[in-house]
């Protein structure tokens, strides 16, 4: 088992970041997380999808005190988000000094780039389907 191999302990999840392009089943997941008293933080469209169902969710903008910019190109790329994902228990003093709250889980999927290519969309539209934040979230959470 991976947890045994890497001497990893099971940890309770207190806070999750959700940022998805494909929102299928995301409301069910958010409802389940909320029922477990897990704080949910989310981006733009995902935030709208979850909040309109009456599920308690906090926007990334509320944490960063900074709006999505550049037509939504920059949402999660912020030290208060990535610091919360990358922080280790040993970083707690640094996190506290900079008001960074830890994330215990990240739920993310990527823009449908392959689908856009197969539809033959124009280059400008295709460039907009190149995901930057999603892969960054996935890499940070893996680390």
Positions of predicted regions on the chain:
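N-terminal glycine-/serine-/threonine-rich phosphate-binding loop
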Residues: 2-62
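Short glycine- and Lys/Arg-enriched binding-loop motifs that mark or flank ligand-binding interfaces
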Residues: 40-41, 79, 129-130
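Glycine-rich nucleotide/cofactor/substrate-binding loop typically near the N-terminus or early
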Residues: 45-113
């Amino acid at each position: 088992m991976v947890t045994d191999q890497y001497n990893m302990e099971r940890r309770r999840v207190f806070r999750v970041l959700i940022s998805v392009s494909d929102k299928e089943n995301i409301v069910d997941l958010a409802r389940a997380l909320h029922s477990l008293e897990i704080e949910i933080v989310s981006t733009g469209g995902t935030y709208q999808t979850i909040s309109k169902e009456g599920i308690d969710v906090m926007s990334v903008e509320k944490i960063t005190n900074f709006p999505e910019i550049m037509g939504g190109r920059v949402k999660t790329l912020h030290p208060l988000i990535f610091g919360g994902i990358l922080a280790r228990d040993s970083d707690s003093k640094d996190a506290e000094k900079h008001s960074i709250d830890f994330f215990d889980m990240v739920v993310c999927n990527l823009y449908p780039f392959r689908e856009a290519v197969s539809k033959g969309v124009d280059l400008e539209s295709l460039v907009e389907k190149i995901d930057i934040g999603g892969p960054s979230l996935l890499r940070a959470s893996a680390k």
